[in-house]
Amino acid sequence: MSHYKTGHKQPRFRYSVLARCVAWANISVQVLFPLAVTFTPVMAARAQHAVQPRLSMGNTTVTADNNVEKNVASFAANAGTFLSSQPDSDATRNFITGMATAKANQEIQEWLGKYGTARVKLNVDKDFSLKDSSLEMLYPIYDTPTNMLFTQGAIHRTDDRTQSNIGFGWRHFSGNDWMAGVNTFIDHDLSRSHTRIGVGAEYWRDYLKLSANGYIRASGWKKSPDIEDYQERPANGWDIRAEGYLPAWPQLGASLMYEQYYGDEVGLFGKDKRQKDPHAISAEVTYTPVPLTQQ
């Protein structure tokens, strides 16, 4: 099955009074009416299953007046810069969309943060789709200074496919020295009805994170929408991940991953590069400047 997009090219025009009104109206709505969200967790998948770190569940109290003042100042500054640039229709649309999605990300994450640890990433492209958007939630069922039993779920949109996962895990904390845990999860591809089961283990220290996952398919052959007269199913496999930094130089970090999958034609590198029992090694080096302190 082929996929294609059709659209119309919009004429470009100089910044008009109408565009200015639309921009200011959007900003006013965001300031005066914070986003109200209701959410029913639909927990279910991700190709990667690195569990979110244990974050503080403490509440941060901020007065409504301070939030409004900060929002007004921020929006006014951004709007002033935007209006002075004499933007066209595309710039106006991008500005409005960016401001709206940023506010939505903030409001949803703060609301979900009342119940657990949440990570929200909403993206809206020029077609107003949710491509590369994701929502992850970790909820502690039993939480003490030394042990935590939790459930975690996620849903995300990648490559025109919607995938989800749900899982349970247990972590043991040895003071401030290290953490070890195990987890089990179910991945489900909502777009193609593929399912797999996974188990994992993790070990963390202040400067090092180690994890390993195994994947077992739970669904059979199905017709592939990408290749004519072809069937597909999840591949069994496993991966090992390491992430850390130098204690003496914390701004310099690195990550390393090895993954292995089994099958005659596994598309680890894409549907057009299928291989037998493929494996891959990926590495990344990051540098985070140390923020300056203020007196």
Curated annotation (Swiss-Prot):
GO BP annotations listed: cell adhesion
Keyword Signal: yes
Listed InterPro entries: IAT_beta, IAT_beta_sf, Intimin-Invasin_domain, Intimin/invasin_bac
Keywords: Signal
Keyword Secreted: no
GO cellular component, one term: cell outer membrane
Region forming the signal peptide: 1-25
Domain of life: Bacteria
Family: Belongs to the intimin/invasin family.
PANTHER family: ATTACHING AND EFFACING PROTEIN HOMOLOG-RELATED, ATTACHING AND EFFACING PROTEIN HOMOLOG-RELATED-RELATED
Protein name, as recorded: Putative attaching and effacing protein homolog
Organism of derivation: Escherichia coli (strain K12)
